[in-house]
Amino acid sequence: DRRQRQMCIRDSMLTAAALLELDFNQPSLDYHELMKLTKILTRDCTEDVENMYRRMCFNVFAHNRDDHSKNFTYIYNEKDDMWRLSPAYDLTYSNTYYGEHTTTVDGNGKNPGKKELVAVGVQAGMKKTYCERVAEEIRLCVNEKLEHYLK
């Protein structure tokens, strides 16, 4: 009946690939665009924007080059009338057949580092000191916890 349907509120999910009409098999995205998409969809939700920054840092330091546009998803919650960044998934050490990140970091797909990570964060409106601190925290954590697997 109607009351049961009202109690069963569904969440919709869309990937960055679907939202931006991208072929996830082709490198066609930069984290600048992912940060902008996250800010727009989540109405500049600080938690989600910072989370996207952390994912970018993790993908760089953990050598997850399979960071294509279908691996970034947003969930719409009808009850709150709001899009949110989904929990992270498909986070694993990986190369691509062309040897670069599928999503570039400030234009660098081959060997992005702290400079590019911070540039993306700052352009997204975060303080440089925050970006540097978070990038270093994630680098140290990945090195400490995943060192054996990243050799």
Regions found by a protein language model. Give the residues of each.
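Short beta-alpha connecting loops at secondary-structure transitions
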Residues: 98-107
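Conserved kinase catalytic-core segment
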Residues: 29-97
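Long, non-coiled-coil amphipathic alpha-helical linker/lever segments
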Residues: 23-26, 124
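Single conserved hydrophobic/aromatic residue that forms the stacking wall/gate
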Residues: 1-9
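Mobile late-domain/C-terminal helix-loop "cap" segments
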Residues: 109-151
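A glycine-rich phosphate-binding loop feature that marks nucleotide/adenosyl-phosphate handling sites
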Residues: 3, 72-79, 136-139
